Swiss-Prot record:
It holds the Pfam family cNMP_binding. GO terms for cellular component: cytoplasm. A nucleoside 3',5'-cyclic phosphate binds at residues 22-141. InterPro entries: cNMP-bd_dom, cNMP-bd_dom_sf, HTH_CRP, RmlC-like_jellyroll, WH-like_DNA-bd_sf, WH_DNA-bd_sf. It is found in: Cytoplasm. One of its GO terms (molecular function) is DNA binding. This is HTH-type transcriptional regulator ArcR. Positively regulates the expression of the arcABDCR operon under anaerobic conditions, thus playing an essential role in arginine catabolism. May also control the expression of genes encoding proteins which are involved in anaerobic metabolism. Can bind cyclic AMP. It comes from Staphylococcus epidermidis (strain ATCC 12228 / FDA PCI 1200).
């Protein structure tokens, strides 16, 4: 690696550290002594970030892009959770030995900073404000997961798709006054997988929502009216 490349990577890590410090509401100076233990990585669309959350030793802050986290239970059920920047994950790995089985995939080109899990736990024990922030983030994540799981209990297909779209607007959508924008990674197939219904049925429901002027396509992005 040339000197210029090393300088660029060092600057990249410094900038990522600033974003991490801002995200968890602490002075960047608290994190700087641990910089050598962290890394910044770029993931291409479709690349696996980790195959199983019980194997990863790091907590990640997603700086750019979109990811999908797939949770598998003992019955073989799959729950798919989507995230956009900024999100810290997987938080349910903290302070416990047994963790849910989760795989993470980059839905778009992504950039993230990895922080050792034991470092995050150490900082929580020594800085109350970090613990409070992470507890708040974990509670928010749990509420989002409950909302998604409740959507899956809907017996009517259209109601299920509609509720999942509302969930997606909150978790990966960008607020534009009268509508939410969901980036181009969203597809009929992905929505079908998340809803647990056929692609054909999902496509039919999406066409109905477009006819009702609830959902629009802007290039490859989805625009969802707040009237949904």
């Amino acid at each position: 690696m040339t000197g210029n490349q090393m300088f660029c990577r060092e600057n990249e890590l410094d900038e990522s550290f600033k974003q991490l410090a801002s995200y968890i509401n602490i002075p960047v100076g608290v994190l700087l002594p641990f910089k050598s233990q962290c890394f910044v990585r770029h993931y291409n669309k479709g690349q696996i970030v980790y195959y199983s959350s019980d194997e990863t030793t790091h907590i990640y802050l997603l700086l750019k892009g979109n990811i999908m986290r797939e949770n598998f239970n003992l019955n073989g059920d799959v729950y798919r959770y989507l995230n956009r920047e900024k999100v810290l994950f997987p938080l349910n790995n903290l302070f416990q030995d047994k963790v849910p089985n989760e795989m993470c995939t980059a839905l778009t080109d992504c950039e993230m900073i990895g922080i050792p899990r034991d470092l995050i736990e150490y900082l929580c024990k020594n800085h109350e404000e970090i613990f409070v922030k992470l507890f708040s983030l974990l509670s928010e994540t749990q509420c989002q997961h409950i909302e998604y799981n409740m959507a899956l209990t809907s017996k009517l297909a259209k109601e299920r798709v509609t509720k999942i779209l509302r969930y997606l607007c909150q978790t990966v959508g960008y607020d534009h006054d009268e509508f939410y924008e969901i980036k181009h990674f969203m597809t009929i197939q992905l929505l079908s997988d998340m809803a647990g219904i056929s692609r054909e049925t999902t496509s039919h429901i999406i066409n109905e929502l477009r006819e009702e002027k609830i959902l629009f396509k802007n290039s490859k992005n989805w625009l969802v009216s707040k009237d949904l």
